[in-house]
Amino acid sequence: MLPRLLAVVRGPGSCRGWREGSPARGSASATVAPPVALPAQAQVVVCGGGIMGTSVAYHLSKMGWKDVVLLEQGRLAAGSTRFCAGILSTARHLAIEQKMADYSNKLYHQLEQETGIQTGYTRTGSIFLAQTQDRLISLKRINSRLNVIGIPCEIISPKKVAELHPLLNVHDLVGAMHVPEDAVVSSADVALALASAASQSGVQIYDRTSILHVMVKKGQVAGVETDKGQIQCQYFVNCAGQWAYELGLCSEEPVSIPLHACEHFYLLTRPWETPLPSSTPTVVDADGRIYIRNWQGGILSGGFEKNPKPIFTEGKNQLEIQNLQEDWDHFEPLLSSLLRRMPQLETLEIVKLVNCPETFTPDMRCIMGESPSVRGYFVLVGMNSAGLSFGGGAGKYLAEWMVYGYPSENVWELDLKRFGALQSSRTFLRHRVMEVMPLLYDLKVPRWDFQTGRQLRTSPLYDRLDAQGARWMEKHGFERPKYFIPPDKDLLALEQSKTFYKPDWFEIVESEVKCCKEAVCVIDMSSFTKFEITSTGDQALEILQYLFSNDLDVPVGHIVHTGMLNERGGYENDCSIARLSKRSFFMISPTDQQVHCWAWLKKYMPEDSNLILEDVTWKYTALNLIGPRTVDVLSELSYAPMTPDHFPSLFCKEMSVGYANGIRVMSMTHTGEPGFMLYIPIEYALHVYNEVMSVGQKYGIRNAGYYALRSLRIEKFFAFWGQDLNTLTTPLECGGESRVKLDKGVDFIGRDALLQQRQNGVYNRLTMFILDDHDTDLDLWPWWGEPIYRNGRYVGKTTSSAYGYTLERHVCLGFVHNFSEDTGEEQVVTADFINRGEYEIDIAGHRFQAKAKLYPVPSLLTHKRRKEDVELSDLHGK
């Protein structure tokens, strides 16, 4: 008999609130049950009866929202959930994914007791194998992060692997990671249990009911049109899995949801002669591209091949997902890998090769959050084959988002608004997911880049820079230079170099940083988001004063660095705004803020024809001229004095540069170094760049990339949104008090929260760490997410890091918390608490001593000095 995993999911008729939306199946003479009418209205309509939809409904009901209707076009748990391999793993690279998986594990563990529905939950533990030292380093990094959030795990030897799972061939292993509290479970039964609990709380569930389109009125969800009638609603949740892309387009105001399906294979065997114990650990052999779990005394094994098969590009998929065509030739490499890992499987009979579609996203992270174009339209899809692991936690965070207006954790890395509509091209998605699926098990070293779907958005200078040796990375679909390879460097060797240690581009970036310090460098920063806000009267100033925390009522020409805060005082954006005229403002934000910031501004801006918001990102090429000789270059090109006396810091002027007029020149560089940003109308971009490079030759000019920018800004303790700052970070927690108009009597979003925080104190503080006993040439490098220890106790994680070429040390930024030794509760973090601690940074299990600083290193260190001449212990913040 086929396993429950493949069997038809049993009906849910025992649950209150459950409705069959179609006649009961039976013989021709059977009595047909009359169709049940849908409610005319509800607060929330959830589309999708898989683990995501049922989890959202479950958590909404737990948070007090009872007026919820869940609609499923087929049968509950009959989509991807039905074919899920049932592996619950907490070992993830991203902190938010670790937290979602940990919550899911705890939820599923108690679900059977809560609902009475057997879910097959069995705590087996997981073993993650390493065939190479680099893979072991990757596991050690994950191990360090899991331990500090309370998930037990350890690095083990091949001998220990053999003890935990005697059937495994361990001769080629260098080590492994054991996570003892991981589990296996029947995903379909978990979905049914969640649905049952939601139904008992008042959620109404209807299967065999298809949503035709989502009705929108004035940019707000108004209801849904189904094949059985309309339901008026305030909120709609798209948990449609395979069908989410098409359903998004069926809205009266289309919603872009970038995901694409690929075929996913796994096999099932009959039991061993002596059946495997139910507690047999799950095995993940990423180097072999396979996973293995116990299944009814035999095994279930699948993987992520190098040459995946995209499916449903045309959008034609079934009402319910069926087992797709077997393809043993395609599965053969995974089967060979499986037999190498478990040679005794050769004698075991295979029951079936399962082929089911799985959805993948352009960046390997799931998609959740509210649509930027339709208020009240929420999305939870694109699990990249981790739906079971993420289902509980993701459903909880999305429900919090809907009920409270924000989730309890920072979920920006999963937010739908990290994508633009341009990333929803079917051709782009088809090509990208063919890369994404194998990447799930590929070794990902720091600073790796996607290779597909590139050159989607480029600066007008792209070809010019590419010809000069630019190496590129992608951000929000935009190509940005990382660094520039000198003619004498081996390009192929550099591109293929992947390491957790000192990278091959180290000396290249060092020379770019040196040029920024001593001469002049040019960085193309055209990808930055650029908005203009104008009005006929004072409307622009009034709304911006409310939306931003710093005072924007400044003289024309001044630039203000400011946060855009939420009601909790957290950063929704961190940006610079130049006042171009009394009624016009120019706003510069991080690249990935383009969709998010636009949606936030439109959410609060009144419908006033006299107030205009325009996205001008594409209108301007941005050149960042950094270094002490920028004054000479621009003076020669503009015939205008550029000294600080004539052009003070944080000032904006419209000037002529070369033959081009209308160049917005700003005295800032985003690095703390002297220089200017040039915002150039795109038709003049090539001319201005050529003129700058030509005149700059006598001053030692060269191109530079974002790696140099990163080193400069981290060394100067400049925090960036999306890396160091997020929606939970407040200005008071990162030294930004001076950029908040708390005492000016002007109301703004987040003001009350900041006033309260100022009175109560902060519970975490952004801190700069300078590594002391770290050998740059021999030791593993810090990148981000490394645990921070104070006096031997865990207090936080790094958010970003870079080698400081001036300090000749690694510099990390991260948040320090003060956990009570007795209760573990968070306490106020003071400057004294920071300064009196002895700190260590954990890099893949090895702790390195570090000096903590609350302020940038004094300016005397801006000149290159020998490491032994710099006594960091004698340095004090300003």
Swiss-Prot record:
The keyword Thylakoid does not apply. Keywords: Mitochondrion, Transit peptide. Transmembrane segments: none annotated. It is found in: Mitochondrion matrix. The keyword Transit peptide applies. GO terms for molecular function: calcium-dependent protein serine/threonine phosphatase regulator activity. GO terms for cellular component: cytoplasm; mitochondrial matrix; mitochondrial pyruvate dehydrogenase (lipoamide) phosphatase complex; mitochondrion; pyruvate dehydrogenase complex. It comes from the Eukaryota. Residues 1-26 form a transit peptide. Decreases the sensitivity of PDP1 to magnesium ions, and this inhibition is reversed by the polyamine spermine. Belongs to the GcvT family. Heterodimer of a catalytic (PDP1) and a regulatory (PDPR) subunit. This is Pyruvate dehydrogenase phosphatase regulatory subunit, mitochondrial. It comes from Bos taurus (Bovine).
